Amino acid sequence: MLITQYLHHQRFSPAAIRLRAMTNETETLTSGIDPASFSSVIKPTNDLFRYVNGPWIDTYRLPDDRSRYGSFDKLAEDAENQVRDILDADDCPATKSQALYHSFLNTDAIEAAGLDPIRDELDLIDSAIDKATLTRVLGTINPAGGPDLFGLAVYGDPGDPDRNIAHLEQAGLCLPDEAYYREDHYAPVREAYVAMVATQLVNAGYAPAAESNGGDELPANTGDDESNAPATVPSEAALDMARHFLAVETKIAANHWDNVATRDSVKTYNPTDYADLAATLKNFDLGSWIDAWQTAYDATKAAKAQPIDFKSVFARVIVHEPSFLTGLDAFWAEADLADLKLWARVHMILGFASSLSRDFDTTNFDFYGKVLSGAKKQRDRWKRAVSLVNGVCGEDVGREYVRLHFPESSKRRMEELVANLIDAYRVSITNSDWLGEDTKAKALEKISKFTPKIGYTNHWRDYSALSVSADALPAENAKAANLYETGYQLAKVGKSVDKDEWLMNPQTVNAYYEPSMNVIVFPAAILQPPFFDPKAEDAANYGGIGAVIGHEIGHGFDDQGSQYDGDGKLNNWWTDEDRKNFEARTGALIAQYNSFVPLQLVEKYADEPDKAPHVNGALTIGENIGDLGGVNIALKAYAFALGKAAGKPDAEEDGSPAAIKALLDTAPEMDGFTGLQRFFLSYASIWRTKNRDELTEQYLQIDPHSPAEFRTNGIASNVDLFYDAFGVTEGDAMWLAPKDRVRIW
């Protein structure tokens, strides 16, 4: 799945005229690239990424409210403004979305309410007299968004992908990943985390603020600017309490699987029934928690619209990290009641902080926005309101977004491109020199069952059960949204998977592959320049959206997707020899990426190079396989498109490297670049981005995507046609010896 989001400014110049087979119209097409923006100092043979993007990176200054900006972010910003216009309109048809939006903007009401929106939940936690009572309290407050010791998600059963099932996953932490609790590198982050938690405990009245020299307590956050308000200074007692909280979370984190282990589709597939699960969580008393949850949920409006039998949800579940549950139960047995209440109290506050008054909201941003991500100021409130709407009921406003901003012609062109990419994968698999015939047959069967979804869903979600109001406080609406989403998801358990349901809104600038359904999905908002431009010659589109399409198809054959068959079932369809060959190739790619350090961190750690964080090749291998396959297959698809345009309908019959190169050589030269060169220049442009150091370091720890420079250079250096395109020779920085180039798809 593509996650990172970035900017590219394009200048289009008319360059060629050709006959479009799709429309039978003569059109003036552009090159789709902007040569004036390229570096005059850096050569593509040494650094393709900075040849295309370096001048922009060197001159662009990140706004204070941004931790990153680039091609994806520019399109996301455009969509954000378009959604805002919809929500601001008097005749907005997305009434639930508009209510959430206006509620979040009512800062006077939010400030007046202070902590009141979650005071009842905190009082319940405080009143627990023993662990049994606390278990019931956690069950009572969980449906509306209370603390989670374990996560619950609903989607297809990998063993029976047509049927929905509950998945139980590790949780219980407020830092991004378990490594933040154990690695020395994150000691400064932990120190800042303690200060933030201590401040929130002061804000909530659980600990005193530090006293000034005159003996008076220092003021809480009350400034006009949300990110520059005078800071509450916690007392030593508050800091001690926060340190204790960190120690409690550290014990939970010790049972977490790391983010590489959680990628293993086989090891995380552990079907379990209620009896076994209850036996595993005997000290926690799962049954008592479920009963309290059911009683609380049944008393809500959401239950009337979406009734749930919560115990039946646990009749059969998939446990992702079994040892986590065992460790969690031991933790619960050994922990003091005071520790558990402290954990629950802080999680309740942090979970709702951004919906509460300024003191809570600002303290939350100062850590999660500034320390972890490097932003210097909070985003404008209306932008946060749009993000809230997109997260809670994105299809409600998304339907209007599609009507106003997505032309059906783009959908038709994308359908053509996707079909071409699938055909190119078919040719690549058929011609593979390392796959055996049995595995080839299964791979071809799988790709024949791929289902592309483009633009928007045909099955819009019904939000009638979502009970939100413009007059309600944001935290109250957040609880209602949690209840709605909980009911919506849990109601699926045991039912057939709705393969028309999307996991992204149409206004999302992203794309994804879902292995359990064998679908590839491309929301409307990504189908714009620099990714897709119907006015550009094919090289730019195949290097842009074509590589993205190829990337998503490639996930069906990466380290995770390759374990699922064409019907979405977790099923080993590989021969042992072919799997061994596959792992040898992916192992070489892992080794390459393990050596990469982003240039900005090379510079940051110049005096201590041994401390510079590296890319985790094992964490990013799935996305790197997707990128590498995406580029190689998009090149083939571009070549076949050139062949068809030249009157060679059987161009796909010969997928040999020589035949592909010959077809690519027929592309017109535009703006001084060949078609093959423009393909790679377009590909590099979609990864144009600039990150703050803090965010780059966070991504290296938790993000399965490699940094943009390596999604460009790390991939291109493994593609033989890149060497042909720019004449890369030994001695150039982008050179990899042929024997060291990884070739998979």
Stretches with model-predicted labels:
Residues 16, 23-26, 76, 251, ...:
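Intrinsically disordered, low-complexity linker/terminal regions across diverse proteins
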Residues 29-34, 174-178, 610-612:
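Flexible glycine/proline-enriched surface loops and loop-helix/loop-strand junctions
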Residues 37-58, 180-202, 621, 628-633:
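Hydrophobic/aromatic-rich, well-ordered segments within soluble, folded domains that form packed cores
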Residues 88-416, 420:
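Noncatalytic, helix-rich "gating/capping" subdomain that lines the substrate-entry/channel surface
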